[in-house]
Amino acid sequence: DAPVELGDPRIELYAAVARRSLDGFADANWHLEQRVSREEGLRMLTLAPAYAAFQETERGSIEVRKQADFSVFSADPMAIPEPGILKIEPELTVIAGEVAYERK
């Protein structure tokens, strides 16, 4: 749905898996049949952009010898109810193996 989304990975994942507005609204125009699984939504935010940038061997997934770029959230977005995805908070962000943000 880019470029209409806000760029926040929580909102992006929610939009992909729920196909609802931020307040939970959806009607026929939201095409709920186009929802994706959480696994596919995660790939859309991680490995797919790396692949599109020809960088899938360096980033896009957590693997040995890949650049360590990742975030840790206050809850598991793969396991909580869909509306909860919007409420999780970043706890830690690592970029190129260095801590860029840590919630105190």
Where would I find each of the regions flagged by the language model?
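His/Asp/Glu-enriched, well-ordered alpha-helical/loop segment
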Residues: 1-79, 83, 88-96
